[in-house]
Each structure stands twice: as structure tokens, then as C-alpha cells.
């Protein structure tokens, strides 16, 4: 927190100075710089000193310290300002902007990058992919734009040679959804010429010193900037491999932004073409120019996607259309050809830079943004524009740059100083007027219609006849000589710092600047022969061709005179200032501590001069006498009314002013506020922070209240919908049910008299609600129909019917035949026809057993063939009563050989073929395997009868009996596991058991 900074660091806010004088201001600035405190506040303005060294002030931990904090809660920092602009945008849904100003080399570009870094770090907590794409594009765009738009100057190693304003769009949650970059006045003359100690744009050196050897070979380039006219001036490549690292960083950034490999290759070819174009030299051949080295054309043609002949024609001549539409080809002199070559190189680089900016904008623009879905879109603008420049030789570019800085200073004065004081007067707030320097006369000197320097420059460019730069200067001397901020050698003959017919001086807010008028007219006209435009429009390279849409015009087409460079720049700056004025501004005022780029040297005079012309002292005085925050009463209440019981949810007082006064007095802030006619003014940010804290505590409660009310309304509405839907559904269901039942009655009303009792009738398709009803009805109908059929069966046959039903349930679909179609006798051994000669002995044996164990009934009896303990087949008989299973010896008066309680039988196994094999599984693991034998007629199917009889008996005794159907039966004989299979043998007369490797095989006679 700022109050935790000890007195040894000075005042963290210049507003807290004991005395507001230049001496005290400079003393505090010097002290903080010497202690490594490069940021200091003036209220909500950040004064930033360029440290000229890396500082550990921008890592993730520092970001977390400033996230969501108020300005005064942490030491001064760019992050605090960025967070304040972000919070203001979110809280009030109002567009904000951050204006970064200062002279060249003061650290504006670095400040803009740190602000972008902070905004990217605190947004998109849910890591949405689209938001991450936009953030990465915004961050990486800086790297690309610096490479193509920045250069080393004598004052700054990474000087922005263009102006940049970036709009970042946010959704209602505060996540970035897109952005747009505006660029202003690229210093394209730097492509041709640089002052001693300076360099061309970084992009050329990065390509020459960082590209792989194979790429350089394909572009016909040498790894030597001194080999090319456009890069051999001034100083050369940076030490330490900075250009090589920059090349790799730019390639990576372009890939992240979305440049395709083809587009990157086209950019590299265009840069190489500019370098080669600069090496094209001309010689006189009679009255016209000729190429010094014709072989260069082949390389240029390859790089630009044109032909050598087309290039030669465009470089050495131009086509002029007469008034009658006749075309005349006019050859260039060597001087004219060199001028055309340089104009073409400048224009190509300018169009390339504009195309790159447009390509970045296409990548970061908001996609699919729907206001109804995402809410209102708000914007944070970040302005990083060239600083005030005073060089040894100042030309047209410095004139435009300094004019831009005058306009921004005018905006600062208008918003911070003039409007601030005017608002206090308008609102009736007691106020002590603060004097300040107004640069409005300087701005008017430059841009005033018909009388300003820009108007006179355009007038000279449009004049008929030969007009030179010296004539333009003479016209300015005549028209502007009386202006207090303008002078020249002619007006001040004793001032030998200026040359006659060359120099003029403007007393800017930041100091006096002497401009050389040489080249003003030419740079303002920005002439480029139409032949070059047509040449590049017809290029085979789609990227290069897209940069020259104006080359499509016919040679004879009459077009309007294009606006001059100065007019275009003025219009763009006026639009920029209007855009900034519509937003809530936040300022970063960058100060350059020295010209030696030293991290320890504090140049008192240089810093004092910057503080003076930036108006920082006046800014302190205005804030000391004024208020940090103001808001119309209705908007103030709208935001904070929930913090006071008398204003929530709506006040009953006469005016909003009374309600605001009541709210602030309840919190005890009456001594820190003033009440205007339409607005409330709050002096310190701490008061506002306290209100915000209380509001933040109450918002969740209000949200819950609103959620409860809204959810209740939604639930009630949904309930009404449901009731209506259920009513409709109920009526419709009743209609469908009624129709179904009527149709069902109609179809089945005569079913009792039908021969099949309705078996052949089709049931109507039921509605979904009656599907279960139909299933139950069909089941009841089947039972009713079965009862109708069964009631005609004699009671004596019912036992047989039940047994057959039980057998069908166990064997139907599993065994080919189970004797359903014949009558079941059960006790076959008591039949004289089935058991001739032995029926009587069997009857005696049955009677003896009945007398002994008193069983109730004989369930089944039959001759069988079985396996004995010696694994031999033997003829036996079985008798099954309701209590026991008996194995009998027929040849010995049916003597009982084995008696097995029926309760010991756990299951039966039969085969799927016609073999009459039955295995009785027992609890004691001594199973009985028999084959029904000696049936009359021969081969009669009785397995199904045996199964059905036993199942029906178990059903009546409520005991479960498992029935298995398989052609490979597992059984246990005296505790040992055996496998029993069946084979059909045509040559076997009677069934017979044989031993096999795994157990036994039953050979069944074939048919």
C-alpha cells in the first residue's frame, strides 16, 4: 500500500506534496527515481520515468497484488491504472481509454505493452478458447508491429515510427472479445534515408541477420546490411544477436496471429524486393535513363511476381494520357528514374505495413458477437503514439509528429484543466482558478483552415507552375510572420541557427523546433507514378496484388485529385481526438530522465523541461483544489442506493440531491463531498472505495433476492404452462382412450360365439398411455379364452392337461417331440397290452409297496435300460410314486433294487433328439441314468410325459425341479463326474449304453 512506502521514498502522489512548486515537484521526482520508484501518481495520472534497465515489477505475483485493488491501496504502478480503467469500464459500462504520452525515448511503447499484459492476465478466468485466441492475438501483435514500424534513432533504440491506437472490445463479463488497431503516419521516408547513428526499420535487419541461409539464398540476399543502399546508412545490425532473436519472435508471433506460411513468405519476398530495388542504379543514355545492371531485373521480377520487361518499362518511363485520350510514353532522366524508384520503395513498404495491420485486425476482430446474448460491448482504448521529437534535422515527418502531440496536449488541457474548472463553475462549486498554458494558438497555427501551415502547404502543392520549397517558405513568412509562435531566418535575420530559404521555427508547447522545409512539398504530394501501381496490381503474387487495388484503374480514367499526406494525417488525428474525447480517459505521462540512456543519471534540466511542457504542475494544482470523482445524482443513487435504508429500493424525498445527501451523511462522508446543481463531487478516492466496499457486500444479498423473485416468477409461469399442457393432454388422452375402448368393444363384442373365441382377431393400436393396459387385457383375454376351452374338458382329463402344460413349459422349442399329441397313460407297467405276462406281478409289487409306505398314487412306470456298477447295460423298470422313485428288477417279480425318496431328486436332464434318455439328478451325487425301453408301439415318445408328470407333482407340492435339455449331459455316479452323450446307429436294434473315454454313450436305434 502507498502508505507503507516510507518517507525515504518520497511522496507516492504528487498531490500530497507539502508545497506545490516546481522545486518540490522535481525533488520528489529525483528522490523516487534514485530509489527505483519509477511510477508516481498525480491523482489518477501515472507519471512514469524510463528506468533504462529491466525491473522485477511485472511478473505474475505483481499482477495478483494489483488485481481488483483501488489505486491508493498499492504503490503507484501501470497495473493500478490499467485495473482502474478496467474496473470503470465494467462498473459503469462506459468506454475508457489510456493515453500514453511523452517525448521519443520516454518509454511509451514499453508502457503500452505492460498495460496490455496486465489486461490479458486478469481476464478470462474460465479459459474460454475464443477469448484466449483474442488475447494471444492482441499480445503478439505488438511484436509484429514493432518489427515493421519501429526503428533505432539517436534518442531511442526501439522508437515507434508510426502512431498506434488499439481498441479492445469486452463483453458484459469483462472478457476481451476482439480488438482493432489504427495506425497513423508511418515514417516511410526512413526506408530511403536515415540520419547518422540511426537505422532503417527493424524488419530489414531481422531478415538479413536472422533468416536461415537457405531462405536468404532463395531471396538472393547477403547476410550483410552494408550491401544494400537502404540499410548501409547510419548504424548497422544490433549487437548480441537481437535481430536474429527478433526474427524468430516475429515468425512465431505471425503464426500465433494466424498468418499462413504463404503470407509470411510473401512478406519476406516484399522486404527482399525493396532491398534489391534500392540497389538499382541508373545511367544517362542520351537524354533518357538506362539501367546500370540489367541482370538485377530478373531477381526483382521473381520476387515481385512480374516480368523483367514490365519492371524495366515502369522504372525507365511513364505513360501519360492527353486530354484527347491519346497515350504518350515519356522516358525518365536518371534523376527522375531514381525518384520514381525511391517513391515506389516507400509506397511498397507503406502498403505492406497497412496490409499487416489489416491482417492482424482480421484475426483479432470480434466474431459472432450478439448483443442479446453477450450484452453491451464496451471498449478500452490504448494510445501509443510517437512522442515529441527534436532532431538535428527536422523534416516533414517531425512536423506531423509534433502536430499530433500538440493535439493530444490540447486534449489533455481540455479534459483535465479547462473542462475540470469549467465544470466546477457550471455546478456552482467554490473554486480557486488555476492558471495554465494553453497551446490552442499553436494548434491553430498548424491546422487553421485557409491560414494554417497545413492549408498553405496544400495550396503550394496544388498551385500551377513551378513551386519550390523555398517559395512555400516565403509564402509562410508573408502570411504567418505576425504569429507569436512562428519565426524564420527572414523574420529574424540575426538568428544564425536558421538558414535563409530553408528553415522555419515553431514555438511548440514542448520547446522550439527548427524545421527544414526541404522535401515538404514532395512528401506532402506523395507522388507515385500510376505505372508502378498497374505493375504491382498485375503481379502474380496474390498478397502483393491485394495491396494495390488502385492499379486497376484505366490509364485514361479521370480521377479526383487525391488528398495530400498532411491533410490525410490531420483528418485521422482529428478523428482520433474525437474518439478519445468520447471515452473516459486515463493518462500515463512518460518522462525521459536523460539523453544518455543511463539508469542512474537524472538530468535536472531535461526533466524540468518535460514536467513544464506536460503541464504536470498545473495538473497537481487542479487536483489539490478539486475533486477526484463526480457523478450525476441519479446515476450515483442508481449505483449506491442499496447502502442506505432511506434510499433503498427507491427514495421518497423531493429530489435526488436530498437523497444523495442523506446517503452520504448516514455514512459520515459529509465533510468529503460537495453538492453541485446536477452532480455530487467527492474529494478523495477513499470515500468512493468505502462506498464500493459496502456495495460489494450487499450485492450478493440483492442478487439472491432478485434470483428468488425471478425464479419464483419463472416457476409460476412454468406451472401455468404445465397446468395448461396437462389440461390439454388430459382431454386428448380421454379422447384417445374413449376411441380405443369403443373400437375394442366393437371388435370383440361377438367373440363368445366365434369358433376360436377371438384368437384370429387383431387388437387395435392402443395410445401410449394404454400400452400396459392392453398387455394386461391381452393376458386376461388369453386366460378367459383358455377357460372357455378348458371348461369343456372332462375333469378326469385335467391332470393330463396340467402335466402337458408343465412339459410344454420346460421342453417346447428345445426338444423335437415330447408326446403332446397322444394320451398319457403314466402307469404303463400295469397295462396288460404294454406289459404282457408281467402286469400282474407288477400289480402285486405296487400293492405291497402301498401297504408298506402308504403312497398315494403311481405317477409313472416303465421298462428302462440302465448302466450298472460294472458299466454294463441292464434291463430294469422304474416306478415313480408321489413319495419315491423305485428301480425294479422285472425278472424277479419286480423286486426293489433301489429306493430313492422323490424329495432327493433335484433335477432332470433330457436330450433334444428322439432318444428316450432321462437322467435323475440327486442330492447325494449318485444320479440315475435310464433309457425308456420296450414301449408299445415301438419308439413311442414318453420322455415329455415323464417330465410333465414330475413337474406337475412338484408344482402341487410347491417344490422346484430343474429340467435341462442338452445332448451332452453331465452326471455323477457314486460321486464321480461322467459325461453322457447320444449317438444314433441305424444297425442297433435296441438302445444300449457303452463306455467311452469321458463316460458313456447311448447308442439309439436309427429310423
Curated annotation (Swiss-Prot):
GO terms for biological process: actin filament organization; actin filament-based movement; endocytosis; Fc-gamma receptor signaling pathway involved in phagocytosis; T cell mediated immunity; T cell migration. Residues 9-696 form the Myosin motor domain. ATP binds at residues 102-109. It is a peripheral membrane protein. It is found in: Cell membrane; Cell projection, Phagocytic cup. It comes from the Eukaryota. Keywords: Actin-binding, Adaptive immunity, ATP-binding, Calmodulin-binding, Cell membrane, Cell projection, Immunity, Lipid-binding, Membrane, Motor protein, Myosin, Nucleotide-binding. InterPro entries: Kinesin_motor_dom_sf, Myosin_head_motor_dom-like, Myosin_TH1, MYSc_Myo1, P-loop_NTPase. Residues 699-728 form the IQ domain. Belongs to the TRAFAC class myosin-kinesin ATPase superfamily. Myosin family. Unconventional myosin required during immune response for detection of rare antigen-presenting cells by regulating T-cell migration. Unconventional myosins are actin-based motor molecules with ATPase activity and serve in intracellular movements. Acts as a regulator of T-cell migration by generating membrane tension, enforcing cell-intrinsic meandering search, thereby enhancing detection of rare antigens during lymph-node surveillance, enabling pathogen eradication. This is Unconventional myosin-Ig. The gene is MYO1G.
Amino acid at each position: 500500500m502507498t502508505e507503507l512506502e516510507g518517507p525515504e521514498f518520497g511522496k507516492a502522489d504528487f498531490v500530497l506534496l507539502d508545497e506545490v512548486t516546481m522545486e518540490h515537484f522535481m525533488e520528489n521526482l529525483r528522490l523516487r527515481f534514485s530509489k527505483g520508484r519509477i511510477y508516481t501518481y498525480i491523482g489518477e495520472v501515472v507519471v512514469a520515468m524510463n528506468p533504462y534497465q529491466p525491473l522485477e515489477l511485472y511478473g505474475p505475483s505483481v499482477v495478483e497484488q494489483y488485481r481488483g485493488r483501488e489505486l491508493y491501496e498499492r504503490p503507484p504502478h501501470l497495473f493500478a491504472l490499467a485495473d482502474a480503467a478496467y474496473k470503470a469500464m465494467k462498473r459503469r459500462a462506459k468506454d475508457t481509454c489510456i493515453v500514453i504520452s511523452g517525448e521519443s525515448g520516454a518509454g511509451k511503447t514499453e508502457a503500452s505493452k505492460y498495460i496490455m499484459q496486465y489486461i490479458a492476465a486478469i481476464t478470462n478466468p474460465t479459459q474460454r478458447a475464443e477469448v484466449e485466441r483474442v488475447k494471444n492475438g492482441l499480445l503478439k501483435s505488438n511484436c509484429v508491429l514493432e518489427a515493421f514500424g519501429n526503428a533505432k534513432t539517436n534518442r531511442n533504440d526501439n522508437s515507434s515510427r508510426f502512431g498506434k491506437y488499439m481498441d479492445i472490445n469486452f463483453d458484459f463479463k469483462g472478457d476481451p472479445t476482439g480488438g482493432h488497431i489504427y495506425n497513423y503516419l508511418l515514417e516511410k521516408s526512413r526506408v530511403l534515408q536515415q540520419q547518422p547513428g540511426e537505422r532503417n526499420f527493424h524488419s530489414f535487419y531481422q531478415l538479413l541477420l536472422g533468416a536461415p541461409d537457405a531462405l536468404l539464398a532463395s531471396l538472393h540476399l547477403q547476410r550483410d546490411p552494408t550491401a544494400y543502399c537502404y540499410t548501409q546508412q547510419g548504424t548497422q545490425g544490433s549487437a548480441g544477436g537481437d535481430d536474429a532473436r527478433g526474427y524468430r519472435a516475429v515468425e512465431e508471433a505471425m503464426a500465433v496471429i494466424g498468418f499462413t506460411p504463404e503470407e509470411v513468405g510473401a512478406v519476406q519476398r516484399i522486404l527482399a524486393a525493396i532491398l534489391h530495388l534500392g540497389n538499382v542504379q541508373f545511367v544517362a543514355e542520351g537524354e533518357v535513363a538506362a539501367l546500370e545492371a540489367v541482370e538485377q531485373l530478373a531477381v526483382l521480377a521473381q520476387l515481385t511476381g512480374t516480368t523483367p520487361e514490365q519492371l524495366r518499362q515502369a522504372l525507365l518511363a511513364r505513360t501519360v494520357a492527353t486530354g484527347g485520350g491519346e497515350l504518350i510514353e515519356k522516358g525518365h532522366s536518371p534523376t527522375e528514374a531514381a525518384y520514381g524508384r525511391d517513391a515506389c520503395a516507400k509506397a511498397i513498404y507503406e502498403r505492406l505495413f497497412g496490409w499487416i495491420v489489416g491482417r492482424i485486425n482480421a484475426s483479432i476482430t470480434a466474431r459472432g458477437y450478439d448483443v442479446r446474448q453477450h450484452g453491451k460491448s464496451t471498449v478500452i482504448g490504448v494510445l501509443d503514439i510517437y512522442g515529441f521529437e527534436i532532431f538535428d534535422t527536422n523534416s516533414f515527418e517531425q512536423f506531423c509528429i509534433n502536430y499530433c502531440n500538440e493535439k493530444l496536449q490540447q486534449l489533455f488541457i481540455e479534459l483535465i484543466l479547462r473542462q475540470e474548472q469549467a465544470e466546477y463553475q457550471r455546478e456552482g462549486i467554490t473554486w480557486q482558478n488555476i492558471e495554465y498554458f494553453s497551446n490552442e494558438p499553436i494548434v491553430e497555427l498548424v491546422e487553421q483552415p485557409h491560414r494554417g501551415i497545413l492549408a498553405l502547404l496544400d495550396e503550394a502543392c496544388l498551385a500551377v507552375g513551378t513551386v519550390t520549397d523555398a517559395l512555400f517558405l516565403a509564402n509562410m513568412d508573408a502570411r504567418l510572420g505576425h504569429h507569436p509562435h512562428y519565426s524564420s531566418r527572414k523574420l529574424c535575420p540575426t538568428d544564425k541557427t536558421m538558414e535563409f530559404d530553408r528553415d522555419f521555427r515553431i514555438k511548440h508547447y514542448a520547446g522550439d523546433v527548427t524545421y527544414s522545409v526541404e522535401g515538404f512539398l514532395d512528401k506532402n504530394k506523395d507522388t507515385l507514378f500510376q505505372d508502378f501501381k498497374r505493375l504491382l496490381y498485375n503481379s502474380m503474387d496474390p498478397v502483393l496484388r491485394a495491396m494495390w487495388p488502385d492499379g486497376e484503374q484505366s490509364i485514361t480514367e479521370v480521377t479526383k485529385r487525391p488528398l495530400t499526406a498532411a491533410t490525410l494525417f490531420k483528418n485521422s488525428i482529428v478523428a482520433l481526438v474525437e474518439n478519445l474525447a468520447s471515452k473516459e480517459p486515463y493518462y500515463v505521462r512518460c518522462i525521459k530522465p536523460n539523453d544518455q540512456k543511463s539508469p542512474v543519471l537524472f538530468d535536472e534540466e531535461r526533466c524540468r523541461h518535460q514536467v513544464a511542457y506536460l503541464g504536470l504542475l498545473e495538473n497537481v494544482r487542479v487536483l489539490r483544489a478539486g475533486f477526484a470523482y463526480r457523478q450525476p445524482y441519479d446515476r450515483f443513487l442508481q449505483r449506491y442506493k442499496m447502502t442506505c435504508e432511506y434510499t433503498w429500493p427507491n427514495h421518497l424525498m423531493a429530489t435526488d440531491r436530498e437523497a444523495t445527501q442523506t446517503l452520504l451523511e448516514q455514512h459520515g462522508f459529509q465533510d468529503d463531498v460537495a453538492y453541485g446543481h446536477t452532480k455530487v463531487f467527492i474529494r478523495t478516492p477513499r470515500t468512493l472505495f468505502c462506498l464500493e466496499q459496502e456495495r460489494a457486500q450487499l450485492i450478493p444479498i440483492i442478487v439472491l433476492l432478485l434470483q428468488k423473485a425471478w425464479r419464483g416468477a419463472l416457476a409460476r409461469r412454468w406451472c401455468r404452462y404445465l397446468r395448461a399442457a396437462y389440461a390439454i393432454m388430459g382431454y386428448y388422452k380421454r379422447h384417445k382412450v374413449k376411441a380405443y375402448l369403443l373400437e375394442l368393444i366393437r371388435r370383440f363384442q361377438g367373440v363368445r360365439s366365434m369358433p376360436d373365441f377371438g384368437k384370429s382377431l387383431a387388437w387395435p393400436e392402443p395410445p401410449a398411455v394404454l400400452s400396459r393396459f392392453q398387455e394386461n387385457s391381452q393376458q386376461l383375454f388369453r386366460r378367459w379364452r383358455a377357460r372357455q376351452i378348458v371348461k369343456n374338458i372332462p375333469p378326469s382329463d385335467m391332470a393330463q392337461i396340467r402335466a402337458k402344460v408343465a412339459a410344454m413349459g420346460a421342453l417346447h422349442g428345445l426338444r423335437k417331440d415330447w408326446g403332446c399329441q397322444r394320451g398319457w397313460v403314466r402307469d404303463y407297467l400295469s397295462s396288460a397290452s404294454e406289459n404282457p405276462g408281467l402286469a400282474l406281478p407288477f400289480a402285486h409289487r405296487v400293492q405291497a409297496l402301498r401297504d408298506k409306505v402308504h403312497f398315494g398314487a403311481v405317477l409313472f412306470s416303465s421298462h428302462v435300460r440302465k448302466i450298472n456298477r460294472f458299466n454294463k447295460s441292464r434291463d430294469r423298470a422304474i416306478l415313480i410314486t408321489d413319495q419315491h422313485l423305485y428301480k425294479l428288477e422285472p425278472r424277479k417279480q419286480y423286486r426293489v433294487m433301489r429306493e430313492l425318496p422323490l424329495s432327493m431328486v433335484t433335477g432332470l436332464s433330457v436330450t433334444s433328439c428322439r432318444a428316450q434318455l432321462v437322467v435323475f439328478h440327486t442330492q447325494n451325487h449318485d444320479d440315475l441314468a435310464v433309457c425308456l425301453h420296450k414301449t408299445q408301439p415301438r419308439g413311442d415318445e414318453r420322455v415329455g410325459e415323464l417330465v410333465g408328470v414330475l413337474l406337475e407333482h412338484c408344482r402341487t407340492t410347491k417344490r422346484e425341479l430343474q429340467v435341462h435339455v442338452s445332448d451332452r449331459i453331465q452326471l455323477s455316479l457314486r460321486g464321480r463326474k461322467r459325461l453322457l452323450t447320444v449317438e444314433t446307429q441305424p444297425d442297433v436294434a435296441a438302445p444300449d449304453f457303452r463306455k467311452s473315454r469321458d463316460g458313456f454313450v447311448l447308442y439309439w436305434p436309427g429310423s
